[in-house]
Amino acid sequence: KDYIDRHFAEEFSLQQMADALHVSPYYLAHVCKEATGYSPLQYVLRRRIGEAQTLLITTDLPVTRIAAQVGYDNPSHFNAQFSKAVGMPPRTFRREYVYHK
C-alpha cells in the first residue's frame, strides 16, 4: 500500500512493483487485496482518481494537467476512468463541487 501511495502516478505493472518489493506478483496481489480490499490495479486506479478529485477541488489546474499529474498519458482515458469511478466527468465534478460549496 505504501509503495503504491508513493508511486501511483507512475506507469503501473504488477511485475515491476513485485520486483521493486522483492516478492512474487501472486504474493503481492494477495497481500494488497488483504490489506486494502482491492487488487493492486484497482487500488492504483482508486488512488489516482482520489488524487484527481483533490486536485480538481483544491486547484485551478486544467483537467489535462491533472490527468498527467496522476499518471494518465491520455486525457480521454482519464475522463473515461474518472466518469466510471465517480459517475460524472472531471469538469462536471469540479463545477458541481464549486456550485455546492
Locate each region found by the language model:
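Short hydrophobic/aromatic patch on the recognition helix
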Residues: 27-28, 32, 77-78, 82
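Terminal helix-turn-helix DNA-binding modules in bacterial transcription factors
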Residues: 2, 6, 11-15, 34-76, ...
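…primarily DNA-binding HTH/wHTH and HhH modules…
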Residues: 80-101
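Residues within the alpha-helical elements of helix-turn-helix
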Residues: 20, 69-70, 85
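An amphipathic alpha-helical interaction segment
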Residues: 1-2, 20, 25-29
